[in-house]
Swiss-Prot record:
One of its GO terms (biological process) is terpenoid biosynthetic process. Its EC number is 1.17.7.4. It comes from Thermoanaerobacter pseudethanolicus (strain ATCC 33223 / 39E) (Clostridium thermohydrosulfuricum). This is 4-hydroxy-3-methylbut-2-enyl diphosphate reductase. The keyword Iron-sulfur applies. InterPro entries: LytB/IspH. It is an enzyme of class 1 (oxidoreductase).
Length: 288
């Protein structure tokens, strides 16, 4: 048996920084209440551990509950400009760990919106990152996530197009070709995070070489779902699991070359636990 791990898998820089910041705030022990706006990452194990240590998840509609001096961690997905203004008025201490790649998208959108450009975001309109980015152009962006939706765009005089940072490269390029037909004066920025691209490319390459592929990450994690889609094109035996507990003998018993990758919200220890469980189920030490 061989266990092969994708060259790029697990925590990305932005997520790692967000988690480290949350634990640093806990260690300060200054008695202030600590909240995260939404789950800091799509990983139930990490969320559970933070909750036990006093970091509570709060949703946008609950922000009125915050009082002066409370700490609010803005997660790597980022938020709208209006939200920053609202929190400043309330006297809430904002700990901003918006991913630098997402911050770049926000800045582009803000700049070109104020130059008079229509804004087009290619991505999932319900994803927190896209919702936040749209908030930097007063929620006026056209959000498209398919070729069909791109064809439904009106003819625009001038527009600026950006991508959700976790988008699949081909998806962005295909939709962009349609957008070009719809805009007379188009400026576009490929704002897909290079860590996302490296993770996707590595998963694509590995899934061509294995008998079974495990994609580890939260079931609600956008980037993990995309990894699964990429892998299952090459390997029909592709499983999306959150942790080692979901692994069964049935998944591995007939396979000798086993591939493992993980989403940006998956800690190293979860990946290690999955590998240990695979070895246990196969009754072998294996090699990596």
């Amino acid at each position: 048996m061989k266990i092969l791990i994708a060259e790029y898998a697990g925590f990305c820089f932005g997520v790692k920084r967000a988690i480290e910041t949350a634990y640093q705030e806990i260690e300060k022990g200054d008695g202030k209440k600590i909240y995260t706006l939404g789950e800091i990452i799509h990983n139930p194990q990490v969320i559970s551990d933070l909750s036990k240590k006093g970091v509570n998840v709060i949703e946008e509609e609950e922000l009125d509950k915050l009082t002066e001096g409370d700490k609010l961690i803005i997660r790597s997905h980022g938020v709208s400009k209006k939200l920053y203004d609202f929190l400043a008025k309330k006297g809430v201490e904002v700990i901003d760990v918006t991913c630098p790649f997402v911050k770049k998208v926000q800045n582009i959108v803000y700049e070109y919106y104020h130059k008079g450009y229509s804004i087009i975001i290619v991505g999932d309109r319900n994803h927190p990152e896209v919702i936040g980015v749209n908030g930097w152009c007063d929620d006026t962006a056209y959000v498209v996530n398919s070729i069909e939706e791109a064809y439904e765009l009106p003819q625009l005089e001038k527009a600026c197009a950006v991508a959700q940072t976790t988008l699949i490269e081909k998806h962005w390029k295909d939709i962009l070709e349609v957008i070009k037909l719809k805009v007379k004066d188009l400026i576009f920025f490929n704002t897909i995070c290079d860590a996302t691209q490296k993770r996707q490319d590595a998963a694509d390459e590995l899934s061509k070489k294995v008998d079974v592929m495990f994609v580890i990450g939260g079931k609600h994690s956008s980037n993990t779902q995309k990894l699964k889609k990429i892998c299952e094109k090459n390997c029909k035996n592709t499983f999306h699991i959150e942790d080692a507990e979901e692994l069964t003998l049935e998944m591995v018993k007939d396979h000798e070359i086993i591939g493992v990758t993980a989403g940006a919200s998956t800690p190293d220890y979860v990946i290690e636990d999955v590998i240990k469980k695979i070895r246990f189920l196969k009754g072998e030490d294996g090699d990596e």
